[in-house]
Amino acid sequence: PYIYYSIKLKNPSRIIKPEYGKFAELTNGNIFYQEFTSNNPLGQIVFLVHGFSTPSIVWKGIAPYLTSAGYDVIAYDHYGRGFSSRPKVDYTKGFYISTLMELIDHLKVKQKVHLIGYSMGGPIVGHFANENPNKVESVNFIAPAGYMFKRKSQSNVYLKILNIPFITKYISVVFPSLMYGGSSSIKLSTDEDENRLSQNELNTVYREQMKYEGFTRSLVSTAKNFNLFNTQKMFQELGKKNINSSVIWGDADEIV
């Protein structure tokens, strides 16, 4: 089965950029991003940072509200997700932070930026703000990751399993191939918002990103190399800095 599924997955170099976005050619490959421009700009820019596996399309319903309020918006896919490249690297905290910094520099953004991160995007923007406070106007969290295990021993067991080479290799290849042509496990039902992300759109992007080798590899590497389970210290350090911040927890949020 392993050999069969290895052949089935497509080479990431064959990823085709959709018309609604752009590629930024960075050090580790292409980062796919969407740019939303306000008709009444305040001269401020927001970077939207998505979570562990669902790519930047999840921001579709949020971006119009931000642009109507005067903000220019950038939403991008992490490496390994969506339409971005799938580099064979360790997906560490530093890797995500440096990618965001490189994208900001690539887009020639000189002013301080507003950061919004949901789920895993929370620790990314939090660590970025801690390390680059002079670059950040505000940092905002939507259901941020970081409190997944109550005891460190639980996360240690999880990481030991993922560090078994055979398991890592098997999951990285077989899982996306089995799901190839399937749908996102997230089911949407809310339909009050005309700007909402439809179930069909979410499923289409999920199917597309799972066609290519490297999607699940990026997830496994992130779980192994980016401490998403205990980020309390990061949040505590951020709280001591003079950076505007907010946290949102939604009891009816169907994505996070």
Where do the PLM segments sit?
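Alpha/beta-hydrolase fold catalytic core
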Residues: 1-44, 68-71, 232
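Active-site loop/oxyanion-hole signature of alpha/beta-hydrolase fold enzymes
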Residues: 27, 34-36, 40, 68, ...
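Flexible "cap/lid" loop of the alpha/beta hydrolase fold
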Residues: 130-131, 138-170
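Conserved alpha/beta-hydrolase catalytic His-Asp/Glu region
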Residues: 150-152, 170-241
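Short beta-strand/loop motif that positions the catalytic acidic residue
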Residues: 241, 247-249, 253
